[in-house]
Structure formats: structure tokens, C-alpha cells
């Protein structure tokens, strides 16, 4: 579960109690039994979680509680032990604060706009485990190992290391701090995992095309529980079917044929990875988004975007089955609700930072993971392309002639067009062009279509049946052309895109 509603952000992730209660009921209704959160939530989350479970004692929900530190430290500090232990101190403080919150004993933690948030509900009996950390950037791990070569081992009250790297020593030390604090303060222990992802897994992927994606391992098998830690360790790994690229290129994965007689590199990777662990392993995240935009592709078709909601559901179910068949101890679908603040590498530069100006972006794959779709509109969208025209009743056309009427609606997410044809022609038989002008910087012609417009057009919508309908853009608005040809590959050297080159 994410932290935000569509129009809130990480600075003030305000979700009300009633919303959480509704969500917990919906989550339980789909036969899920555990909710994972990345970090401390607002007090209403824990209040609602406690109340929901008290009302449903026979089928309670369980919690996997994430603990992290400010991820910008990975860049600004660059070393887990750097700047006199700045990250260590922040991470250990987050651990002890989280333990206090879980045991309902905190009124000193600030949360968003709440300066002293009160956490007074003890939900510890419902906590299945703590998951410590972030998706570690390889250069952060490498720098930590390089700068702290003398930190070869750690032995604490409840955890110790064997053949560990300095970065793994950092994790062991932090985990031991959490376990020691919870044991001493609350006479309680909770299972602990250290978050990992495929980029820093303990395997070597010889066919990974990008060296940074297989540069350094984080092997939590080097961290061992001492006999005094009764709750024990488990492993938590984010596992996606499209990233990193090795999953598309590693021959032994691509050549793996599952019981459906289809290639299944995802399951092959799961099997390979599971063998590396002596503790229970869960998928801390897995899933695919139903966004229009695509950020990564999978040889299985399990792409990061470009999927229908039906495909999203089917692929998610198949991955859950693969995880179960490979005897993972559990799997957490990413994620419960759509979040509008999230961006992918190919959209982040063009997204507003102000949450009040934020809109859903169908081009951003990160916004389409939610099982719970968050659509524009306070109660409902102004239009839905479902074949019903009832929401257009009473609207005046913005354009009309003897054969055509064009109607327009807008909301936070989309521009809706409804074209009504006068006469006997069916939509399948019509071939129409609709030029769309946004700011007057477009083109007055579309060369390939031999069209000339009375005013500059930024986009051209061609309606030509189910298979040939398309939306064309003026070259000036082609973001991907600019990103690749100009910024990334330097194939073209220009100070700004040339305007009015034509729509194509």
C-alpha cells in the first residue's frame, strides 16, 4: 500500500481513517491476508488497522512494516558509514521510532503536517515482520564497500555476520539495533528482513547488457541470527518480470519451458534465486501496470506498461502462481492504489512538482500499478468511453457542419471527444481528421496526409476504424525524439526543437 491519495504527496500524505477502513475491507474481500507498507504511515492507518482487526478477530490482516531512511542520502552522502555515520544514525533512529509506533508508544514523531503525531494503538501482534531498507543503488553499495574495507565483520546481541561485505555489516548493525531495542523495551521480537532487488541480488547474470545492473551483490545470507533472536530472519526481494534486462537475455531463463509449454524466464529466475537462501523468501513487490506508456519491455509480454487492466490482472495472477510454485513464503502485489505523484524515467522531467497541479498521467508506467484505480473526478469521471452517450446530453457542439458534430469535455486526466455523424454512415466507414491546437505553436500542415489547417495544430487525430485510428503529433511536441536524438544520443545539435516542421 502506498502513502498517498491522487492529490496528496509524500510531504503531506493525508489519507483519512474511513478510507483506510474501506480499503482494509476490500483487501480482505479479495482473500489477501497481509498489507505491506514502505515506511511509517499516518496515525489513522494504525488506528484503522487496529479497529479492523478487532472487528474481524477470526480473519485479521497482518502487516509487513517497512523501515527506511531518506533515499537522497544515497547520492548526497554516498557511503553508508559516511559523514560520521549520518545514514547509520538516521536508519537506527527510524528503527527505534518504528518500534515505538508499532507498540502504540509514540507521540514524538512528526508526520506530514502533524508536528507531534500520536500513535497509541499497539498492533504488534499483527506485525508479520519488519523489512529494512530501500532498493539499493549499486554505486552506493560499491562506495560503502570500497571506503570501509576494514569493516569485515559484525557481532551484536542478536545478529552476526559471516564473510560479509562492509555494506552487509551496515545492514546487520542496523537490524541488531532494532531487535535489541524492541527486545529490551517491549520484551518482544519480530521477524526481520533486509530489502533487496534484482539489481543487487547475489547471482551473476552474464547476459545483463548494462554493467551497473549486475555490478555488486548484497547477500543477506551473510547475516545470521544468533540463538537469542527467536523470531528469526527472512528475505524480502522486489521481483519484476521486465527489469533488469538480464531476465530477457539470460539463455537459461529464456529457454525455460514451464508446465504450460511456454517460455517463462520469470519463473526460471525465481527458481535460481530461491536456491541462494536458507531462510524463508518473500517477493516484497511484484506486478505490472496498466498504463498507456511503457517504460520497460518483457520477452513474455509482461511489460512495464502498455497493458489492459484484464492483462494486468491475468499476468499478476500468473506471477503469484509462479511464486507459490517455487515455494516462496509469500508475495506482495505492487500496489494497492494508484498514486499520481509517481513518475518513470521517461516522464519525470515533464511532471509538475506541485501536487495541486498534478494530474493522472497515462504515459507514466509508475501510476498504473494499483489494483484500486484512481480516476479523475471527485465522484466520477466526466466521461467514460463505454458506448453510452448519456453524459453528453445537453452539450453544445464545438464544431458542426452538415454531416458532423464534434463535442468536447475535459477533466484532470484526459481530453474527451465525441463525434456524432449525421446520416447513415457508420463509424467503421468514416475517415475523419480532427486537428487539435493547444498553444498556437504547432504546424499548419500535415505533409503525409496532404492536409492544410487554418490555424496551427499541435496534434492530429485520425479516425479510421478500429485498426487504423491514430493520434499524430507535431515534431515540436515529440518528447521521445528530443530525449533520444538530442539529449541522449546527441544525433542532432539544436538549442531547441524546430517549430512548425509538420505533423507526422
Predicted stretch roles:
Residues 207-299:
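Glycoside hydrolase catalytic-domain groove-lining segments
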Residues 294-301, 306-307, 311, 315, ...:
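Aromatic-rich peripheral "rim/lid" segments of glycoside hydrolase catalytic domains that contact
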Residues 107-119, 165-220, 237, 266, ...:
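Aromatic-lined carbohydrate-recognition surfaces of secreted/lumenal glycan-active proteins
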